[in-house]
Amino acid sequence: MSQSTATYINVIGAGLAGSEAAYQIAKRGIPVKLYEMRGVKATPQHKTTNFAELVCSNSFRGDSLTNAVGLLKEEMRRLDSIIMRNGEANRVPAGGAMAVDREGYAKSVTAELENHPLIEVIRDEITEIPNDAITVIATGPLTSDALAEKIHAVNGGDGFYFYDAAAPIIDKSTIDMSKVYLKSRYDKGEAAYLNCPMTKEEFMAFHEALTTAEEAPLNSFEKEKYFEGCMPIEVMAKRGIKTMLYGPMKPVGLEYPDDYTGPRDGEFKTPYAVVQLRQDNAAGSLYNIVGFQTHLKWGEQKRVFQMIPGLENAEFVRYGVMHRNSYMDSPNLLTETFQSRSNPNLFFAGQMTGVEGYVESAASGLVAGINAARLFKREEALIFPQTTAIGSLPHYVTHADSKHFQPMNVNFGIIKELEGPRIRDKKERYEAIASRALADLDTCLALL
């Protein structure tokens, strides 16, 4: 297939990946037609018509370079990511993590793209894959059925899916502050989380209620299949009575404050279990229940989650919801630049490619956008080295075992190992990986 001679590039979908791709293309002096159907047609999960809306959590996760996602974010900052830049401008306290005021952040991304002189925003649903120009498809895990059929047809591959869930958000003014305390795990960073401690008796009663609560129904033809990073809390609870104690209710590093007077198990300094609440907006009036993605019926959510100490009278401004997410057989269908193997004028980006997470989705849009622009200019594709986070992620999703392919978060396990003797200290090893990654990325920057 010959390269398109159009004078612009299409980007379909203005989520995190599409927004990033559109910006990276326009930054390189190429006109962009950015299509977004929200405003014309709603999705089951989005609440606004803003671009790059965050629907599951307001957290971009850890910020340290000894954390793989922290490294990925730093690489993206150096590549002038619109998502990272606007995220930084709308940060809210979150200890050692990066969390944002989701409304302020999405509005600022939207405004920047809508006001860009080279970006034409078109509010319309796309049901056919355009063949008039180089196109980046970033319609996300909630891709409409009509377009999903065309994507499957053009790729000649089967679609996959998994379920994704969002946590409830509560009104801070309805939290009983006498029963909770402010602290970040291990006192890392500023004290940014409200902690709801549980005794063993309280936890056992909560576990019983959670595992017997009624879930919202699924379509009978859909087999449940969850991505581990966004698993419903009730599914986790059913895996074992202590599973949550090693997950979102882990008490380690969240000791009682000296002035705590509530119930506790004997003289223990650490609660048996802890539910954490994280600030969800800049005003600090909303908090989400960390790790409590759920598919329980709304009435059951209210009944069960009000058993959490401090939330007995909590007001839920949004209940948890679950939706089906689609993703592609990327190992067979895409190259490391997220370019279609069967149609070189077509790129894909975002969670539909099998990257998992906000930051990872934006990173895939960055890679696809840069390479769509390079194709437009008839320049050689830019493949970031596997020593970097932004290079290792697309390499993983396009080289994984297709038969067992599952969505993947960025992690140090997929980054190329260091040469020489293994550094035994994990922190030092990760620091060395990060140092090498940023040095190698700086070499790539010279090509841009």
Curated annotation (Swiss-Prot):
It catalyses: uridine(54) in tRNA + (6R)-5,10-methylene-5,6,7,8-tetrahydrofolate + NADH + H(+) = 5-methyluridine(54) in tRNA + (6S)-5,6,7,8-tetrahydrofolate + NAD(+); uridine(54) in tRNA + (6R)-5,10-methylene-5,6,7,8-tetrahydrofolate + NADPH + H(+) = 5-methyluridine(54) in tRNA + (6S)-5,6,7,8-tetrahydrofolate + NADP(+). The keyword Transmembrane does not apply. GO terms for molecular function: flavin adenine dinucleotide binding; tRNA (uracil(54)-C5)-methyltransferase activity, 5,10-methylenetetrahydrofolate-dependent. Its cofactor is FAD. Signal peptide: none annotated. It comes from the Bacteria. Its main location: cytoplasm. FAD binds at residues 13-18. GO terms for cellular component: cytosol. Coiled coil: none annotated. The keyword Heme does not apply. Keywords: Cytoplasm, FAD, Flavoprotein, Methyltransferase, NAD, NADP, Transferase, tRNA processing. One of its GO terms (biological process) is tRNA methylation. InterPro entries: FAD/NAD-bd_sf, MnmG-rel, MnmG-rel_CS, MnmG_N, TrmFO. It is found in: Cytoplasm. Its EC number is 2.1.1.74. Gene3D superfamilies: FAD/NAD(P)-binding domain. Catalyzes the folate-dependent formation of 5-methyl-uridine at position 54 (M-5-U54) in all tRNAs. NCBIfam families: gid_trmFO (TIGR00137), PRK05335.1 (NF003739). Belongs to the MnmG family. TrmFO subfamily. PANTHER family: GLUCOSE INHIBITED DIVISION PROTEIN A, METHYLENETETRAHYDROFOLATE--TRNA-(URACIL-5-)-METHYLTRANSFERASE TRMFO. This is Methylenetetrahydrofolate--tRNA-(uracil-5-)-methyltransferase TrmFO. The lineage of its organism: Bacteria, Bacillati, Bacillota, Bacilli, Lactobacillales.
